[in-house]
Amino acid sequence: MTESDVDSGSKKYLSNHKGIFIHVTLEELKRYHQLTPEQKRLIRAIVKTLIHNPQLLDESSYLYRLLASKAISQFVCPLCLMPFSSSVSLKQHIRYTEHTKVCPVCKKEFTSTDSALDHVCKKHNICVS
């Protein structure tokens, strides 16, 4: 399966020649072509997984906001999605800030912030490192 790019104004398309097209900017296309074959395989595996398991997209709003925050900083609070410049700042934020006790992904309620953080890490694999 090879990717081809088809020019369409300011947008480019990635295609597997089987009818699935993804709109990307020229910058995104350049970055895609710089990826290793393993990274490209991972992207295809993620897309296939989401196509075969669309229920995973039920958490898409939260996951999109999480990824957007991660683009700013690798240190993001999993409960409020606030980005921080360091791991220390994030841990201080979690320790001293009162957070919601509701899971931002599945909306399950908890009695403490710690139990909500524990749940988000164990059930949704979004952990504070």
From Swiss-Prot:
<feature type="zinc finger region" description="C2H2-type 2">
    <location>
        <begin position="101"/>
        <end position="124"/>
    </location>
</feature>
<dbReference type="InterPro" id="IPR036236">
    <property type="entry name" value="Znf_C2H2_sf"/>
</dbReference>
<dbReference type="InterPro" id="IPR054177">
    <property type="entry name" value="B129_C2H2-Znf"/>
</dbReference>
<dbReference type="GO" id="GO:0008270">
    <property type="term" value="F:zinc ion binding"/>
</dbReference>
<dbReference type="Pfam" id="PF22034">
    <property type="entry name" value="B129_C2H2-zf"/>
</dbReference>
<dbReference type="InterPro" id="IPR013087">
    <property type="entry name" value="Znf_C2H2_type"/>
</dbReference>
<keyword id="KW-0862">Zinc</keyword>
<keyword id="KW-0863">Zinc-finger</keyword>
<keyword id="KW-0677">Repeat</keyword>
<protein>
    <recommendedName>
        <fullName>Uncharacterized protein B-129</fullName>
    </recommendedName>
</protein>
<keyword id="KW-0479">Metal-binding</keyword>
<dbReference type="InterPro" id="IPR041661">
    <property type="entry name" value="ZN622/Rei1/Reh1_Znf-C2H2"/>
</dbReference>
<comment type="function">
    <text>Essential for virus function.</text>
</comment>
<dbReference type="Pfam" id="PF12756">
    <property type="entry name" value="zf-C2H2_2"/>
</dbReference>
<feature type="zinc finger region" description="C2H2-type 1">
    <location>
        <begin position="75"/>
        <end position="99"/>
    </location>
</feature>
